[in-house]
């Protein structure tokens, strides 16, 4: 998947302080790491739960790099079987170009790298370490990887030492760990969707913001985006605010339990896929 030109143009105009904002110490650390990643061409590992914005960060690194004129090629490692993924990345044979070749002079974004089997992870680790692929040719692309699990954790299924090959490693915080940033995020998202949909930007009432800050957002920023988009599109903040409170009332524990269950199930699926 190659980045949309409109998205790239929009991201290229944003300074880092406006792209990654927030007052928590964790967000300050994110900005610090990304500042370093913007100064070189070395591999980057982006960690974070689903919905925290890993791909957007990868795209931001691309459009603010010297490779911005090249392609941004995304490979969803969790959507393809390991056998097909090998060919997708490195080519079926010498005559077939894989994603590594297609990303030449640009950025190769490997999403959910922990979904790969160990053999393919070793190939990626080799490329990260030596800058070459199995046929001896050079990798002429910046490699940015993302994962929703801790690569050093026992349930990740990642090859030992894989994470050590990344010069830059950044963890995007789940929204529940940066609730004080929610009002600022809401303001940004309201303006964004109002501009995209040609609507007047509503001013969110304190009651709505309070309700947003009390919720733990298992879907993270993506879930918040969905609610803000609905408020902007339908133009009924009070109605949507009441709907939000109705849907989330008493569901905090259920939502978080479901979130953790899904993560555990994903780990089991990875182990099963390797055994097949």
Model-assigned labels for residue ranges:
Residues 69-71, 164, 178-181:
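Short acidic capping loops at alpha-helix termini that bridge into adjacent secondary structure
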Residues 5-138, 142-154, 175, 194-237:
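AAA+ ATPase active-site-proximal loops
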Residues 62, 90, 125, 163, ...:
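Conserved protein kinase catalytic domain
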Residues 1, 103, 113, 133, ...:
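Generic low-polarity alpha-helical segments
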Residues 95-98, 161, 188:
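A general alpha-helical scaffold signature found inside nucleotide-binding enzyme cores
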Residues 8, 12, 18-22, 29, ...:
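Bacterial helix-turn-helix/winged-helix DNA-binding modules and their immediately adjacent linkers
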